[in-house]
Amino acid sequence: MKLHMLNMLNCLLLTVCDGHLHMHGNGATQVFKPRLVLKCPNAAQLIQPGKLQRQLLLP
């Protein structure tokens, strides 16, 4: 469940950064493509799994 939330948040974040990103059933594959991270350098630190997971685990 937490992993699903992590993937969803990353998909939404990258969709905002990259207007050409299309959401598919296997969105997780899209999320971790390096080119998408490079297109959105300001959000790169949010995309790091460790940081985002810590945010999800906080109340």
From Swiss-Prot:
Residues 1-19 form the signal peptide. The keyword Signal applies. GO terms for cellular component: extracellular region. It is found in: Secreted. Its main location: secreted. Salivary glands. Keywords: Secreted, Signal. The keyword Membrane does not apply. Anti-inflammatory peptide that may facilitate successful blood feeding of ticks and may lead to immunotolerance in its host. Inhibits the secretion of inflammatory factors in rat splenocytes, such as tumor necrosis factor-alpha (TNF), interleukin-1, interleukin-8 (CXCL8) and interferon-gamma (IFNG). In addition, shows strong free radical scavenging and antioxidant activities in vitro. In vivo, inhibits adjuvant-induced paw inflammation in mouse models. This is Anti-inflammatory peptide amregulin. It comes from Amblyomma variegatum. The lineage of its organism: Eukaryota, Metazoa, Ecdysozoa, Arthropoda, Chelicerata.
